[in-house]
């Protein structure tokens, strides 16, 4: 077994690379195969006959058990075995065809390959070497029959044609089915390969499927390939290979094949069978390394190419390893040349780099074979890695998915997986049986057992589906299919011009049914058998009623034989008459003109076709034969026309098509606009979606329409998130009155066709609300559905600017009534919008409906509405480019240069919208004068907002937010300046929408000005004849800009613009104006479609030439005029301010005084110091509530104001303030508290200021360091007495340690200050040792209740632990009560004895009156801690955890994974206590019971000092117990024992002579021996300590880190 595993593992590493299985996986697979009886011995794995049974068995196991590990391992092993056999066969074939000996080997296969002796010996684990005699015998040529030769030279004898050598000129490839070796006998002869072909002889490359000479010198035209692929996308970096005539010729690769391969890779992917077939075809013959790399660069992207290069290198290394072992390997030239290497195989050797001629001349045929085969194998690996196949086990047939589509997905996934080929068919068939729909599964179960392939199963299912019951839609599709012969006959007749007298087209013959003649001209005319027979229909002679021409109303011309009456030639089917009557007496076949209204360039805009008027068709379908090839089409939402037997694919016109019917007199019916379907049908059909629009009247409609109106073509499918599982929210109950109203509204919507009955698995609630008029409104709560949708992006970036309408043009406003209800939902999305109409008391089944149109409240409804209406109006925009049509949601505004043009355009727009299914409210059509649109009133020259109230009601933050939103909407029209918006912005600060707000005086004054402004200000409509001007200015609290005309003379504003709120701490005015100019230019182009003609800048820019860099960047590309003038009068309302470009701050020293500043967060002071002669002057400011940055800024501001008219140097160690002050070199807008402080100081100065930054606490000597140190010392100096410490604590409530450092007082004084604070000491201070552990058993217990759900119904466990011995007692209770606590303690006393004290939390069960009385009767002291806090209860809390873990382990061991049966709970609880108390825990050598009943006698330990509250170390103590984090110490004088934290204990080295000797020391403090300096007995104590460590008591296991 081990030898076989070793051989297989080596083969897998060779042929599988990094993904090879481990030896452990191979061994597990072999063990499984032997266990299942699939292998008699491991060596049977080498037999090809056993591969298929193993594959089938492992595949079935993976399907049944879901365990595919062995199958994956077997797939890799099988691949390695097959590759090894193929390599052996290839080697034998290569040797044979190259004339180097070896027998002719048949293609590899289980039946024809016999294991050689070497392999059989390897099966037995023997190491086998090949002798020289064996190799010679194997290499010797074998006598064979004369093969059929082709016209190329022979490898063995060199004969041109017809040689009798046992070789063929087109040798077989190493893999079955592909030709591999070309005729390259002369290539590389000068390297000593023994050929006779001269250097210049041309040897053609053997192409796939043929052999012969190449037509002269040629090359692979990579440049042409690159040009053809330029439009397809893949990056092409290959360069052409140029082969000169003096070198050996190399037949080029066909560029078309490479182009087609690259396109296949891009569209089908790397793993596609089509891709692999094309790659194998291109590489069926040897290629140069240059061609191989160029080919891979073309078809692979950068990342796959990098993977391929690595994989190719690995494959070539394998070839080199094989060639190294075998000197006569084909790559070594059969031993007649130097051995190959990696540089030669990659074309990197001398004379080969970038030289295709050198590669063709120097590479041996065997090397070319290895290069190409390795490249192909590397491509297969890259295809598997770059495009991993999807998991086939997760594929199931969808509810609406056809079986063929399901089979396509499944087969593609299985064939792209790593399953062995022999396992794929069984897997596919099993998936058919388990993953298809239930009805398909029943069909497959009933299938005969002889169906064993996927193809047979698919054919069987499709055949059975054909006899399924027919539906209405199926019958309609069958009729449509059956009518095609008649339609084609008539269409051909019309096209061929076969007309009778008077130009009328002839019908069908009464006798034979053929077109082109009547019965009278029929050559097959029969004489009437009974000329005297009378017709009962027309009372005529010579025919009966069945033969009467008047029967069908076809002007005496009956349908032919086999054709029923009407337009449906369906034999043995009910006759279906046309469901229409045509007032103009037209025939069903009409002449139609189609006009393309799109903007795409086409050869012809209009075409004439013949179409059938068909009321049985839901939609209009244009035959692909009639559809112009250059008219664009797109994929439809429903890509098929469904009917019996499935459907036919269809597409939809991308452009709107105008359809017009030509009457007999040549006139044109009213044309109709629609998006027709385009399909491969035998004749065009005008369906019900356009018959009414063409003036036809429909009667007796057959069947039920499956589409709504033309608008269905405009339905936009919704996008759902990946996890859009159905949502079901129950309908909440409604009162009877609202339920009646809901029922009425639902019935109304059902009659209008807005909803339809539903059986959807989605449901969301509906409700009604009463409107002001008293009627009810239906609302649908779609929040849960919206959460599953992917919102559409915004398609309209804001509302249109109405002032851009040309001045003086007449206007018309249209309103679309119920716009959402006029646009249908895509059919596949309707079920998600289902709801339930409940009944009272569930007395009847609830009725369920779903929306067919856009529901209100759906997140995508507004966007879809805008898209659909815009798509309907797009042809009109193209048809009337001069018409101004503003569309926002369901509101339309039309503007034309004349009243007549406006009326004509309005009628056309209304007609187009109505034909598309929309409704226009006639009473809402507005015409001048005084139209209103989007909240504005429009006149012939102005645009003014409407709807401002006298004074809004403000109560909350949300009210202020709504008001500010309304003002933001009005600002561009009214020009509300920033100073009037400031009071409202101030009220927006806050985070709670319900936070109270008041209508203060500032808001009232600002609102009064805004209302006054709305009565006088308005926008002027744009006059295209006048230049467009723009202006900007600085004003209070911001900047303002305007677009208009005549701004400097007679201002006519068209649009106001404002600077944005600052986002930085400080923004210079120059930057604000730069951003506003950029915004103004962009708004002009976006609104008016043109650049500003004249730009007015503030006068300061005229004085400062050239213009600043920021202004120049804002004016980049500006071609208009720039004027600098005083502020225009139009800005008076904004109170404009002068812009100063003067620089106020510099970073270079200036002549003048120097001040140093600093601030401290500990003292909350900011100071300024400066030198006056020999001494330093100091000025300081203190603010306990300010941050250190604000203190630094205030200190610098204080320094700036010391000498406001004198240049001043300010030195600071704050980088923050220094950088900010430098940015404030020019005037600007501050936005933070620090920036406001500095800006206020700079605005009061008239002289230059320099800010200099130095590093604090630097040791560099000099004036700056000295001044900074003085400022720092003054900022941090404080002399707080005890009273000031109390004041500091009262203000900040800091702790004693911080108070001690801040006020330079002792810790004891600081603690006393904190303890006197009533807010910081709601509980008394805890002394050290308040939570001691017992020094011996029965001194202190800890008790707690813990919940264990596994012990339900009595799931409360009372736990008591002895703090000295760690012994645990547990009892079980149903509730936490005082009685339960008392019962538990009585049990614990019976087990362990009566304790002196018990500590618990302060729960009611422990602090009740009855519990206190019970403890008093037993004489037990009781203390409490903090409930829910481990402080004081750490040991029992850890005991709870330890107990629960033990219960869980014991329960799972008995098979109780969740709840423990009641009958087993008592026994299991006893087992847990036994395990915890009677066995050692951790490193302890004694059990808790042993420590409890045989305690260790404690003796005094070494002397120590303890730290008392004053911070001093007190002597006179000895250690009794050293625990985890705490120690018990005993006073030598008073015998007082206390517990103190271990950090407050240290050895008392002054008392070493009084130390208790080691034989008297307690083992409980052995852990501290490493820091007790016993000099005289150091070694002895250490030895004792080592021995004592093994006897440390067990309480350390439960010791608490109690503070």
Swiss-Prot record:
Residues carrying the site annotation Involved in capsid protein dimerization upon acidification: 418, 430
Zinc finger regions, Integrase-type: 1280-1321
Keywords: Aspartyl protease, DNA integration, DNA recombination, DNA-binding, DNA-directed DNA polymerase, Endonuclease, Hydrolase, Magnesium, Metal-binding, Multifunctional enzyme, Nuclease, Nucleotidyltransferase, Protease, Repeat, RNA-binding, RNA-directed DNA polymerase, Transferase, Viral genome integration, Virion, Virus entry into host cell, Zinc, Zinc-finger
Positions with a binding annotation for Mg(2+) 2: 1158, 1192, 1213, 1272
Residue intervals of the RNase H type-1 domain: 1149-1280
Xref: PROSITE patterns: ASP_PROT_RETROV (PS50175), ASP_PROTEASE (PS00141), INTEGRASE (PS50994), INTEGRASE_DBD (PS51027), RNASE_H_1 (PS50879), RT_POL (PS50878), ZF_CCHC (PS50158), ZF_INTEGRASE (PS50876)
Region entry Involved in homooctamerization, spans: 1548-1567
ZnF (CCHC-type) residues: 507-524, 533-550
GO terms under biological process: DNA integration; DNA recombination; establishment of integrated proviral latency; proteolysis; symbiont entry into host cell; viral genome integration into host DNA; viral translational frameshifting
Motif (LYPX(n)L motif): 180-184
Residue ranges for the DNA-binding region feature of this UniProt entry: 1502-1550
Domain named Reverse transcriptase: residues: 750-938
InterPro entries, per the entry: Aspartic_peptidase_AS, DNA/RNA_pol_sf, Gag_M, Integrase-like_N, Integrase_C_dom_sf_retrovir, Integrase_C_retrovir, Integrase_cat-core, Integrase_Zn-bd_dom_N
A Pfam family the protein falls into: IN_DBD_C
Post-translational modification as stated in the protein's UniProt record: Capsid protein p27: The cleavage at the C-terminus is slowly trimmed by the viral protease, sometimes being cut internally thereby generating the short version of the capsid protein and a capsid protein C-terminally extended by 3 amino acids in a ratio of 2:1.
Any one GO cellular component localisation term in the record: virion component
Gene Ontology molecular function, alphabetical: aspartic-type endopeptidase activity; DNA binding; DNA-directed DNA polymerase activity; RNA stem-loop binding; RNA-directed DNA polymerase activity; RNA-DNA hybrid ribonuclease activity; zinc ion binding
Residue positions of the active site: 614 (for protease activity)
Motif stretch (Nuclear export signal): 219-229
Note: Reverse transcriptase: Error-prone enzyme that lacks a proof-reading function. High mutations rate is a direct consequence of this characteristic. RT also displays frequent template switching leading to high recombination rate. Recombination mostly occurs between homologous regions of the two copackaged RNA genomes. If these two RNA molecules derive from different viral strains, reverse transcription will give rise to highly recombinated proviral DNAs.
Reported function: Capsid protein p27: Self-associates to form the irregular polyhedron core composed of hexamers and pentamers, that encapsulates the genomic RNA-nucleocapsid complex. Assembles as a tube in vitro. Binds to inositol hexakisphosphate (IP6), which allows the assembly of the polyhedral capsid. Spacer peptide: Plays a role in the oligomerization of the Gag polyprotein and in the stabilization of the immature particle. Essential layering element during tube assembly.
Annotated domain remarks: Capsid protein p27: Proton-driven dimerization of the C-terminus facilitates capsid assembly.
Protein name: Gag-Pol polyprotein
The species this protein was found in: Avian leukosis virus subgroup A (isolate RSA)
Gene designation per UniProt: gag-pol
């Amino acid at each position: 077994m081990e030898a076989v595993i070793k051989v297989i593992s080596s083969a897998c590493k060779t042929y599988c690379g990094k993904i090879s299985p481990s030896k452990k996986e191979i061994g597990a697979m072999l063990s499984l195969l032997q266990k299942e009886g699939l292998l008699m011995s491991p060596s049977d794995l080498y037999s090809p006959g056993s591969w298929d049974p193993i594959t089938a068995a492992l595949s079935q196991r993976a399907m049944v058990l879901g365990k595919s590990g062995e199958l994956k391992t077997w797939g890799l092993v099988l691949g390695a075995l097959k590759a090894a056999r193929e390599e052996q066969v290839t080697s034998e074939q290569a040797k044979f065809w190259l004339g180097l000996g070896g027998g002719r080997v048949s293609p590899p296969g289980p039946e024809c390959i016999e294991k050689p002796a070497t392999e059989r010996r390897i099966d037995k684990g023997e190491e086998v070497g090949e002798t020289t005699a064996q190799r010679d015998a194997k290499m010797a040529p074998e006598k064979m029959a004369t093969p059929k030769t082709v016209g190329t030279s022979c490898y063995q004898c060199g004969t041109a044609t017809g040689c009798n050598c046992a070789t063929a000129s087109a040798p077989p490839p190493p893999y079955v089915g592909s030709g591999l070796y070309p005729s390259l006998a002369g290539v590389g002869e000068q390297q000593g390969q023994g050929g006779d072909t001269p250097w210049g002889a041309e040897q053609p490359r053997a192409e796939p499927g043929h052999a012969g000479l190449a037509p002269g010198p040629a090359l692979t035209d990579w440049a042409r390939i690159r040009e053809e692929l330029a439009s397809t996308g893949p990056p092409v970096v290959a360069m052409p290979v140029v082969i000169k005539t003096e070198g050996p010729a190399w037949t080029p690769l066909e560029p078309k094949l490479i182009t087609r391969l690259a396109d296949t890779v891009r569209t089908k992917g790397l793993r596609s069978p089509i891709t692999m077939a094309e790659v194998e075809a291109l590489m069926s013959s040897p290629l140069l390394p240059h061609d191989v790399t160029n080919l891979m660069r073309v078809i692979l992207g950068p990342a796959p190419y990098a993977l391929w290069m690595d994989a190719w290198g690995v494959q070539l290394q394998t070839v080199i390893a094989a060639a190294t072992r075998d000197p006569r390997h084909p790559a070594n030239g059969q031993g007649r040349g130097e051995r190959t290497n990696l540089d030669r195989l990659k074309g990197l050797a001398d004379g080969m780099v970038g030289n295709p001629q050198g590669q063709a001349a120097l590479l041996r045929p065997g090397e070319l074979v290895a290069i190409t085969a390795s490249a192909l194998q590397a491509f297969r690996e890259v295809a598997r890695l770059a495009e991993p196949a999807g998991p086939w086990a997760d594929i199931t047939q969808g509810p609406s998915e056809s079986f063929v589509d399901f089979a396509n997905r499944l087969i593609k996934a299985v064939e792209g997986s790593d399953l062995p080929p022999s396992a794929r068919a069984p897997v596919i068939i099993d998936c058919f049986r388990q993953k298809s729909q239930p009805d398909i599964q029943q069909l497959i179960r009933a299938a005969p057992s002889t169906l064993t392939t996927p193809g047979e199963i698919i054919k069987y299912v499709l055949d059975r589906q054909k006899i399924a019951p027919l539906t209405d839609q199926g019958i309609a599709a069958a009729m449509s299919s059956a009518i095609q012969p008649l339609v084609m006959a008539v269409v051909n007749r019309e096209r061929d011009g076969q007309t009778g007298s008077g130009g009328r087209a002839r019908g069908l013959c009464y006798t034979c049914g053929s077109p082109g003649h009547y019965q009278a001209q029929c050559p097959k005319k029969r004489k009437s058998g009974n000329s005297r027979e009378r017709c009962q229909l027309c009372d005529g002679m010579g025919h009966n009623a069945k033969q009467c021409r008047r029967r069908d109303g076809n002007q005496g011309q009956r349908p032919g034989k086999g054709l029923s009456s009407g337009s449906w030639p369906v034999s043995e089917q009910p006759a279906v008459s046309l469901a229409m009557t045509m007032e103009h007496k037209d025939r069903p076949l009409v002449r139609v003109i189609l006009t393309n209204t799109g903007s795409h360039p086409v050869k012809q805009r209009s075409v004439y076709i013949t179409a059938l008027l068909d009321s049985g068709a839901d939609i209009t379908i244009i035959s692909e034969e009639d559809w112009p090839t250059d008219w664009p089409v797109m994929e439809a939402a429903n890509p098929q026309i469904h009917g019996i037997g499935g459907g036919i694919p269809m597409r939809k016109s991308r452009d709107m098509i105008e359809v017009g019917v030509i009457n007999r007199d040549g006139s044109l019916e009213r044309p109709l606009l629609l998006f027709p379907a385009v399909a491969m049908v035998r004749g065009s059909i005008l369906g019900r979606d356009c018959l009414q629009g063409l003036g036809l009247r429909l009667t007796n409609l057959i069947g039920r329409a499956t589409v709504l109106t033309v608008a269905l073509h405009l339905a936009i499918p919704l996008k759902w998130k990946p996890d859009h599982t159905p949502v079901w929210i129950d309908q909440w109950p409604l009162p009877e009155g609202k339920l009646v109203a809901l029922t009425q509204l639902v019935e109304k919507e059902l009659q209008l066709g807005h909803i339809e009955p539903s059986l959807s698995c989605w449901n969301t609630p509906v409700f009604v609300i009463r409107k002001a008029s008293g009627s009810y409104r239906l609302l649908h709560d779609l929040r849960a559905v919206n959460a599953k949708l992917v919102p559409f992006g915004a398609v309209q970036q804001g509302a249109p600017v109405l002032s851009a309408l040309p001045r003086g043009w007449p206007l018309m406003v249209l309103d679309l009534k119920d716009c959402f209800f006029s646009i249908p939902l895509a059919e596949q999305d309707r079920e998600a919008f289902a709801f339930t109409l409940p009944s009272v008391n569930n007395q009847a089944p609830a009725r369920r409906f779903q929306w067919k149109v856009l529901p209100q409240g759906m997140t995508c409804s507004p966007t879809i509405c805008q898209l659909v209406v815009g798509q309907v109006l797009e042809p009109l925009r193209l048809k009337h480019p001069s018409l101004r049509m503003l569309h926002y949601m369901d509101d339309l505004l039309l503007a034309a240069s004349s009243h007549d043009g406006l009326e004509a355009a309005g009628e056309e727009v209304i007609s187009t919208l109505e034909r598309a299914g929309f409704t226009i409210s006639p009473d809402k059509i507005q015409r001048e004068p005084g139209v209103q649109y989007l909240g504005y009133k429009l006149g012939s020259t102005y645009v003014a907002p409407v709807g401002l109230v006298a004074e809004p009601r403000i109560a909350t933050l949300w009210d202020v937010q709504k008001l500010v939103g309304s003002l933001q909407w009005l600002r561009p029209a009214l020009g509300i300046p920033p100073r009037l918006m400031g009071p409202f912005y101030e009220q927006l600060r806050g985070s709670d929408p319900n936070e109270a707000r008041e209508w203060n005086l500032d808001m009232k004054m600002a609102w009064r000005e805004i209302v006054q402004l709305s009565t006088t200000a308005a926008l002027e409509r744009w006059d295209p004849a006048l230049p467009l001007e723009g202006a900007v200015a600085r004003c209070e609290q911001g900047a303002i800009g305007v677009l208009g005309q005549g701004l400097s003379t007679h201002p006519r504003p068209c649009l106001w613009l404002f600077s944005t709120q600052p986002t930085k701490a400080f923004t210079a005015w120059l930057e604000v104006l730069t951003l506003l100019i950029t915004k103004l230019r962009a708004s002009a182009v976006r609104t008016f479609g043109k650049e500003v003609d004249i730009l007015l800048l503030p006068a300061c820019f005229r004085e400062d030439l050239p213009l600043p860099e920021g202004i120049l960047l804002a004016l980049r590309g500006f071609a208009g005029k720039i004027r600098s003038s005083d502020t225009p009068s139009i800005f008076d309302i904004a109170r404009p301010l002068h812009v100063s470009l003067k620089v106020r701050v510099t970073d270079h020293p200036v002549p003048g005084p120097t001040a140093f500043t600093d601030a401290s967060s500990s003292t909350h002071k900011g100071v300024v110091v400066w030198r006056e002669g020999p001494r330093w002057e100091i000025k300081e400011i203190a603010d306990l509530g300010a941050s250190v940055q604000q203190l630094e800024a205030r200190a610098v501001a204080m320094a700036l104001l010391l000498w406001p008219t004198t240049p001043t140097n300010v030195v600071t160690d704050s980088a923050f303030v220094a950088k900010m002050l430098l940015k404030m070199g020019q005037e600007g807008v501050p936005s933070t508290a620090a920036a406001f402080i500095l800006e206020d100081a700079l605005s009061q100065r008239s002289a230059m200021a320099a800010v200099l930054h130095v590093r604090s606490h630097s040791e560099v000597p000099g004036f700056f360091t000295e001044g900074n140190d003085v400022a720092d010392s003054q900022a941090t100096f404080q002399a707080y007495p005890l009273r000031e410490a109390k004041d500091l604590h009262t203000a900040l409530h800091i702790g004693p340690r911080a108070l001690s450092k801040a006020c330079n007082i002792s810790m004891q004084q600081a603690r006393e200050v904190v303890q006197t604070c009533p807010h910081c000491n709601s509980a008394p201070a805890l002394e050290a040792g308040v939570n001691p552990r017992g020094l011996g058993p029965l001194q202190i217990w800890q008790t707690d209740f813990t919940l264990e759900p596994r012990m339900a119904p009595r799931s409360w466990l009372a736990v008591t632990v002895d703090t000295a011995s760690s012994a645990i007692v547990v009892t079980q209770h149903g509730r936490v009560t005082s009685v339960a606590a008392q019962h538990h303690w009585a049990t614990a006393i019976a087990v362990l004895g009566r304790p002196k004290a018990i500590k618990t939390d302060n729960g009611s069960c422990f602090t009740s009156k009855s519990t206190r009385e019970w403890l008093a009767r037993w004489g037990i002291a009781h203390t409490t801690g903090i409930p829910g806090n481990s402080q004081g209860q750490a040991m029992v809390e850890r005991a709870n955890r330890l107990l629960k873990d033990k219960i869980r382990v014991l329960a799972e061991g008995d098979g109780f994974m969740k709840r423990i049966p009641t009958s087993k709970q008592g026994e299991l609880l006893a087992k847990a206590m036994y395990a915890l108390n009677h066995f050692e825990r951790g490193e302890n050598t004694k059990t808790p019971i042993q420590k409890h009943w045989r305690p260790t006698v404690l003796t005094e330990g070494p002397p120590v000092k303890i730290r008392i509250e004053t911070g001093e170390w007190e002597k006179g103590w000895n250690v009794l117990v050293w625990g985890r984090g705490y120690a018990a110490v005993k006073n030598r004088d008073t015998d007082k024992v206390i517990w103190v934290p271990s950090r407050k204990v240290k050895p008392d080295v002054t008392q070493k002579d009084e130390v208790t000797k080691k034989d008297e020391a307690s083992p409980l403090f052995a852990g501290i021996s490493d820091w007790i300096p016993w000099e005289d007995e150091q070694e002895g104590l250490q030895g004792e300590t080592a021995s004592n460590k093994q006897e440390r008591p067990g309480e350390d296991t439960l010791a608490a880190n109690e503070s």
